[in-house]
């Protein structure tokens, strides 16, 4: 798995200053929650900094990644990066950063949530909403 500095730099290069600052705030909040709920702070830090890596992709980039990684998007997700970025971001993190399945799920569901979320998923979900 890539280290924090490598992921930080890669995410920073792909996002606007405003979106990157949001990722920093989300990370800080998520680490606070990780301390409270006994989750791995380093893992949380990596997930949170990378959670929006796909948020500002162009439609062309989305199409390319969907084809490359065989990502299923429904019709609404295809037209709305606000919904699809979490799925696409999870796949980017899996293949480019070597995130494990648990980390990828936290990214995949950080926008919509889901039933029976793990503590890690909840931390990222809430930190994103409040960060």
Q: Language-model features: where?
A:
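N-terminal glycine-rich anion-binding loops that anchor highly charged ligand groups
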Residues: 22
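Non-catalytic terminal extensions that flank enzyme cores
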Residues: 1-4
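Divalent metal-dependent catalytic cores for phosphoryl transfer on phosphate-bearing substrates
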Residues: 6-14, 31-131
């Amino acid at each position: 798995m890539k280290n924090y500095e490598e992921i930080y730099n890669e995410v920073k290069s792909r996002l606007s200053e405003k979106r990157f600052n949001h990722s920093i705030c989300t990370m800080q909040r998520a680490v606070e929650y990780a301390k409270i709920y006994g989750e791995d702070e380093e893992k949380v830090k990596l997930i949170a900094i990378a959670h929006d890596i796909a948020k500002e992709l162009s439609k062309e980039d989305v199409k390319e990644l969907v084809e490359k990684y065989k990502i299923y998007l429904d019709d609404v997700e295809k037209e709305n990066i606000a919904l699809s970025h979490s799925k696409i971001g999870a796949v980017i993190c899996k293949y480019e950063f070597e995130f494990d399945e648990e980390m990828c799920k936290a990214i995949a569901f950080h926008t919509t949530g889901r039933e029976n979320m793990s503590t890690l998923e909840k931390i990222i979900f809430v930190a994103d909403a409040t960060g």
